[in-house]
Amino acid sequence: MSIDKSKIMKAVGKPVRMTYPGSEGTHRGVLNFREIAWSGKGRTGALYCTVVDIIRFDGKREPWLRIGYYRQPTGTTLPRWASQTTYCGPLSQWRNNVLPVLQKLLKRAAQSIA
């Protein structure tokens, strides 16, 4: 059994919304681009995949990047959006703040398994 990529990719080009906790409101936009990283089976046999999305939110001057995941329970054919929360932010924030930290962590992880 595998996750049907077309079911996950069908969201590209469709409206999305993101609601902040509290009183910060809701962003609405369009999912412009998506890449899938296959994660494999969990301990219960459910299938997982991580998605990296580029979203163009209304009124924002640059696209935002979001990372989330889908889960397909054993015995089903429909993957479901499973991220309770996601990290979503402008591309410049990822480039300037998040990617340098991820690079450090990946380097440490690679050294620890070498």
Predicted regions and their residues:
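Negatively charged, low-complexity tracts enriched in Asp/Glu with abundant Ser/Thr
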Residues: 1-48
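Mixed-charge, Lys/Arg-enriched low-complexity segments
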Residues: 2, 6-7, 71-114
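Weak global preference for isoleucine
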Residues: 3, 8, 36, 54-55, ...
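Compositionally biased, intrinsically disordered low-complexity segments
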Residues: 19, 39, 55-58, 101
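A short, structured beta-strand/loop element
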Residues: 47-82
